[in-house]
Amino acid sequence: MKKDDISNIKVLLNTPKKIVIVPHKNPDGDAMGSALGLCLYLKKKGHIATVIAPNDYPEFLKWLPGNEEVINYEMENSISENIISSADVIFTLDFNILHRCGEMETPIKNANAVKIMIDHHQEPDSYADYTYSDVNMCSTSQMVYHFIEKMEDLNYIDIAIGEALYTGIMTDTASFRFPLTTSITHKVIAQLIELGVQKSKIHDAIYDTNSFGRLQLLGCAMNNLQFLENYSTSYITLTKKELDYHGFKKGDTEGFVNYGLSLKGAKLAAIFIEHKQEGITTID
């Protein structure tokens, strides 16, 4: 992000604003962690901040601080669009192409608000007035930490904000094991722990609250695991029938793809999940 952009955003956020924060459709830990962390920070700054998620997200993320005030666009369409149309600022987090927020694309595109993108994926689109994009970052949640740092407001980060950001970083790095988990990432995590964030509490809430059905679905996924040794590639498939049989709930397949990466010799892993009601097969 350019110095002029930082200065302009500081001025923009210097007085109370109506702000909307939007994660991508089917929000994961990083999307919700970064959104809620940023929202709590902006509220401490005196802004009216609202997280509007395009649709529902996993139960294991609903303990996060600020979760009770998240608006589900899919369930509260009219309310959401009124808030979006009257917003002064819209932050889009953890995505860089507007269609990734589903049916929210049009109201966001039509809004007169200043738009700010914070994201770590490749090839960002040019819809935002200000773009903070860094493909070398492990997560958008770490970028939100650095955004707050650029605003010279690290003193605003408390345990609640820290828990949200820690969750996002942890989940998007498979518990800090992916290559983009750098020494800077660990320094950020250390700062959050020093603030009082309890890492074991977060780990338990995310990884140790499995339903019986989810573990059975994991077993099904492992049974479907294939390894193309000549291509150093593994993949998992799950059909709609298999999802239904095991009582699939949103978020149940979170992290399944990482098991494919754990195979010796695997350099690429993918999971293909059939969603007949939406007419699509998702690939992660």
Show the residue positions of the predicted features.
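Short glycine/serine/threonine-rich phosphate/pyrophosphate-binding segments
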Residues: 29-35, 98-102
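Glycine-rich, phosphate-binding/catalytic loops in enzymes
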Residues: 38-39, 107-110, 133-134, 187
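Hydrophobic helix-and-loop "lid/oligomerization" segment in the mid-to-C-terminal part
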Residues: 2-25, 33-65, 69-71, 78-81, ...
